[in-house]
Regions:
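C-terminal catalytic/acceptor-binding lobe
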Residues: 169-224
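Short, high-confidence coil segments that cap the C-terminus of an alpha-helix
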Residues: 74, 102-103, 204
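Short beta-strand-to-loop acidic/aromatic patch adjacent to the donor-nucleotide binding site
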Residues: 63-85
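Polar low-complexity intrinsically disordered regions
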Residues: 11, 83, 95-97
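Short, conserved alpha-helix that lines the donor NDP-sugar binding/gating region
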Residues: 44-70, 196-197
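N-proximal low-complexity "stem/linker" segments adjacent to membrane-targeting elements
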Residues: 1-45
């Protein structure tokens, strides 16, 4: 049986003890699941730059360059942020679901700081944005009864599996902003949103597995 080749993209430079435990437990289990793996870890203060750096981008390589300059063979990229806390089985479930459903972009869920909403927008509701200045993020209640994967407008890069061929379909820089430009409003999108909308234009939609919810470690200031 051929091994599945996964490159783990880990943007950041500060990794907590909880992340270290999660990561160590995961890499210990990978060989048992017939997975050949590698890691790409980069840091930059600019989120767009660090995502492209994790993919081996070259600032003078031109728009037609491919991830890792086409020199690295892989089947999937797994993006994990430095503040995620997870169990190995959550990754294996994500990978298996992507294979079973032939899904090119698949993510689990994680709460954003504040703990009330996930880093996921299902509907690109422009009218909601015009009134509020942000899009409506999913809540735990929104997904409490959902068991099957479903398509979303965009989700965070924090726990994201991407099949080979997606980034390869895009011009460099592979991760770049797009714009909301309508009715006098002009705003730049986030890294995840820009990438996923450009990928969708190439036929690669983004899906969520609502049964996979990982931890998101954030500091809290306690005060009276």
């Amino acid at each position: 049986m051929n091994k599945t080749k996964v490159i783990f993209c880990l943007p950041g430079r500060t990794f907590s003890d909880n992340f270290l435990k999660s990561w160590t437990n995961l890499v210990t289990e990978l060989p048992k699941h017939n997975i050949k793996w590698a890691m790409s870890q980069k840091y930059h203060v600019n989120r767009y730059f660090v995502c492209n750096a994790c993919l081996g981008g070259n600032s003078i390589g031109g728009k037609n360059q491919k991830p890792f300059q086409g020199k690295v063979d892989y089947d999937y990229l797994m993006w994990i942020d430095s503040d995620q806390v997870f169990e190995p089985q959550q990754f294996f479930n994500l990978l298996n679901k992507a294979k079973e459903t032939n899904t090119s972009i698949l993510s689990g869920l994680y709460l954003m700081q504040g703990g009330e909403v996930f880093a996921t927008v299902e509907d690109w509701d422009k009218e909601f944005f015009k009134k509020n200045g942000y899009f409506k993020f999913l809540t735990p209640e929104d997904v409490s009864s959902r068991k099957e994967i479903f398509k979303v407008s965009y989700t965070g890069f924090g726990w994201l599996l991407v099949k080979r061929g997606v980034f390869e379909s895009l011009d460099y820089p592979w991760v770049q902003p797009t714009w909301f430009d309508e009715d006098g409003i002009r705003e730049m999108t986030t890294t995840d949103c820009g990438f996923m909308h450009r990928a969708a234009e190439k036929g690669f939609d983004t899906y969520i597995d609502p049964t996979i919810i990982v931890g998101h470690e954030k500091s809290t200031i306690l005060q009276v």
